[in-house]
A protein has these predicted regions:
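A detector of single, family-specific signature residues
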Residues: 1-446
Length: 446
């Protein structure tokens, strides 16, 4: 055998051929000011080009891809930079895959924009990339507004903490005597302080009769050193808090308009007919909107509040069949173990280290609220806590809630909770069956 034949044979053995699933695929590496675009090598002399990020540049990208006869495009979900290019490509009729950046990592030592774009194009042409979940236009609008409302609520709470800090620096301890500084009594006292009142005795008429603290405790808490700089900070923080509350109300009006566009033309029950509004809940009748959108009441699920159900809707939409199964749904929410198996053995089962989205956080908060409840879910939470700790119990219970939500929304099933005695009996019988099976295995081994 000649040397040339040996070399050609060794080359054939070293190469791995992958079937082309998407022969007309392109890959784009997204950036803030530059986008690198790669097309198949047989589409021209130049298969990788860099474009700017202005609107006219995005149109040039779409035009060039049309000239190269590309019909499907893959791009990384890099920050928010992908959004405008994604919208332009969809308008021009391309099938666009938005891909998790972890799934497109290039070989170490070959990191630059052009090689990344070529690598994405190669993976996409071989059908190795999966598109992220993307909601429709209405859900996208709702998600943007609900996320903005959440940010406003968090900013609002920061100003409350700064108000408390200002009073603490003046040794005004009223925030340790009453439970809520933004309630009726707390707001009245802060407004009086800003208005110039300094005598503790004059604050007593502002105290609501439902406050549990005694008059003596309230009087003691309102004696301090009234420093001008801290009074100025208190006034500014209070005004900013009120401003944030106004902005939250305006944001809720926009959210309600979106919900109205998603529901049939029927009258929504007024605020007076809904259950009592808790703190930080929307000012409109969220439950009725959700009931009409889903045709079932998801707020009946243990621990799921109105704002929690609204956040889940804004993140997942109304069509949960996109996930295929409840297992994929809880995996997307990062509420199941990331099992790593090697040699037939489980070597790791920890959760993926990624920030949970708003829907996952809503399920976790609902699960945490069940730790002292006297229903079957609370019993399950406490059993999981004794097994693996608080965090383990929250994730396990949140997974239960996510599965219940998935079945209710997708299959239009009503929430039918177990009786706690029946649930405990079911668990007892299952444990007996497990122990009997383990005993038989030990007897066989002996």
């Amino acid at each position: 055998m000649s040397k040339d034949e040996k070399k050609s044979r060794s080359k054939k053995r070293g190469t791995v051929s992958m079937p082309l699933v998407n022969p007309n695929a392109a890959g784009i590496d997204i950036g803030d000011s530059l986008h690198a675009v790669a097309v198949p090598p047989d589409r021209g002399e130049v298969c990788v080009r860099e474009f700017g990020a202005f609107t006219e540049d995005l149109e040039k990208i779409a035009t060039w891809l049309k000239q190269c006869k590309v019909d499907t495009v893959a791009m990384e979900s890099t920050g928010i930079y992908w959004r405008n290019l994604f919208a332009v490509l969809v308008q021009h009729g391309f099938e666009v895959y938005l891909v998790n950046a972890k799934h497109t990592r290039n070989i170490t030592g070959k990191k630059d924009d052009e090689s990344d774009a070529q690598w994405i194009q190669k993976l996409h042409s071989c059908g190795l990339l999966k598109s992220c979940f993307l909601p429709d236009d209405k859900i996208e609008t709702l998600r943007t507004l609900v996320r903005h409302r959440r940010s406003l609520t968090q900013d609002s709470s920061r100003y409350v903490l700064r108000m408390q800090k200002s009073m603490e620096l003046m040794n005004i301890k009223i925030h340790t005597v009453i439970s809520d500084m933004t309630g009726k009594t707390g707001t009245a006292i802060v407004k009086a302080i800003i208005g110039g009142e300094r005598e503790p005795q004059n604050f007593l008429p502002l105290v609501d009769s439902r406050i549990k603290a005694t008059k003596e405790e309230i009087l003691k808490s309102l004696k301090g050193n009234w420093r001008s700089e801290h009074l100025f900070l208190l006034k500014q923080c209070y005004n900013l808090y009120q401003h944030m509350q106004t902005q939250i109300e305006l944001c809720e009006q926009q959210i309600e308009k979106v919900l109205q566009s998603m529901t049939p033309d029927e009258d929504i029950a007024s605020q007076s007919t809904r259950r009592k509004r808790s703190k930080n809940q929307p000012r409109f009748n969220t439950t009725d909107y959700l009931r009409r959108i889903h045709t079932i009441d998801v707020t009946q699920i243990f621990g799921v509040s109105e704002i929690g159900a609204l956040e889940i809707l804004s993140e997942t939409g109304t069509d949960l069949s996109k996930w295929g199964s409840e297992k994929r749904f809880v995996s997307w929410l990062n509420l199941c173990p990331n099992n790593k198996i090697s040699g037939g053995k489980l070597i790791s089962s920890q959760l993926l280290k990624k920030k949970p989205n708003a829907a996952s956080q809503a399920f976790r908060m609902a699960a945490n609220s069940q730790k002292t409840s006297k229903n079957w879910l609370g019993d399950y939470f406490r059993r999981m806590r004794s097994k693996g700790g608080q965090k383990y119990a929250i994730v396990a219970t949140a997974r239960k809630l996510a599965i219940i939500y998935y079945k209710m929304v997708r299959y239009k099933q009503s929430f039918t909770p177990f009786d706690i005695d029946q649930y405990r009996e079911k668990y007892r019988l299952a444990k007996i069956k497990y122990l009997e099976k383990a005993l038989k295995q030990l007897q066989v081994a002996a």
